[in-house]
Amino acid sequence: MSVTAPQAPSCILHDAGTCRSCPHLSVPLPDQLAVKQSRVSSLLAEHVPADLWRSPALSAPERFRNKAKMAVAGTTARPTLGILDGTGHGVDLRSCPLHETAIEEALPVLADLITDLGLRPYDVPTRRGELKHVLVTASPDDDLMVRFVLRSRRHLERLRAALPDLRRSLPQLAVLGVNIQGVHQAVIEGPEEIVLTEEDRLLMRL
C-alpha cells in the first residue's frame, strides 16, 4: 500500500514574495528530505556505513511551531505582527501556516488589544514607540503564554488593567507577562520580567 507523502503548506506570504523565511517552500517535501539525507550521509560516509542508515521520517509540514516571536511595527491603529523588512518596517505574518492553530487564532485578538490600549509599536528607523515584540507560546493543551516586550514600564499598568477583558477575549490565556527591553539593539528580550497573572509558567505535557 502506498502512502501519500505530506506536501509543503500553501503560503500566500511566500507566494507573494512577502516572506522568504522558508526559502525551499516550493520544493516538494520528499525532495527536500532526499537532499538533506544525501548531504548528511556524505558528510558521515567515513564513519557510518551506507547500510546502517534508516529511511528518514517526514515531520508535520505545518502547524508544528508552538512559539511565535512577532516583531510589532506599523501604527497603533494598524499594527503589524511578524518580521521587519530591510528598512526596519513591519511585514505582517499573522497568517503564517507554521504556527499552531491556537497561536494563529490569538494573534488578531492581541492586535486588537494593541489598538484598544494605544500601545505604540516601536519604530526602528526613528527609535520611537514602546511595544517591540509580542511573544506567544502554546502548550499541548492549547493554553497560552503571552509576553509583551516593551521599551519601558510606561504601559505596564494599562496592560494589568486590561487582563480581565483579555481573558474574556482569549479564554485559553494562562500566563500574561511584560518584558522590559530598553536598548536599541537587535535583542528580543531584556533582563526584567514582570508577570501579571497568578500563574507564572505554562504546563507543557509530554
Q: What label would you give each PLM region?
A:
Residues 1-206:
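Accessory RNA-recognition modules of RNA-modification enzymes
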